[in-house]
Each structure stands twice: as structure tokens, then as C-alpha cells.
Amino acid sequence: MSIFNSIVSLGSVSSSNKVSVANGSSSSSFGSNGISGAKTSAKVNATANVNAIADVNALLATATNAANTNVNVASATSLKL
């Protein structure tokens, strides 16, 4: 279950890495760079989302490989019996 819990937590973390700019007036929250700063932040967060997705996919692959290994070991054991 620890792998499943890791996948769930990664998914929730990635959802927080979003930046929305409603209009020009909201750009002040990004400091002196204004909209340019907002675009940079959005790019950084988009990269974080991609990395989080890659991490989840890696965990899924690990879980799948582990499950397949367990099935193969079980099959080999039953054949020997």
C-alpha cells in the first residue's frame, strides 16, 4: 500500500502547482516582473507538473513490475510443487 499512497500524494501535490492570472491587475503579486514574471512562474510550475506525472508513471511501472514478479514467482513455485 505504500506505493499506492505515494502515487496518491504525488497526484495531490501536482494539483497545487498551478498559476492562474485573471487579468493585468493580478500581475502585481508576481513582483516587478509583472506578467513576464507570471509567465515564468507558470512555466516552472508546468515543469513541476510534468515531473510529478513522470514520478507517478515511474511508481506505476515499479508497482506493475513488482506485481508481475510476484505472479511469476508464484507460478514458478506452483509448477515446482
Swiss-Prot record:
Q: Which domain of life is it from?
A: Eukaryota
Region (Disordered) location = 11-34
Q: Which InterPro entries match?
A: HssA/B-related (IPR008455)
Q: Which organism was this protein described from? A: Dictyostelium discoideum
A single Pfam family it belongs to is Coiled
What is this protein identified as? Putative uncharacterized protein DDB_G0283135
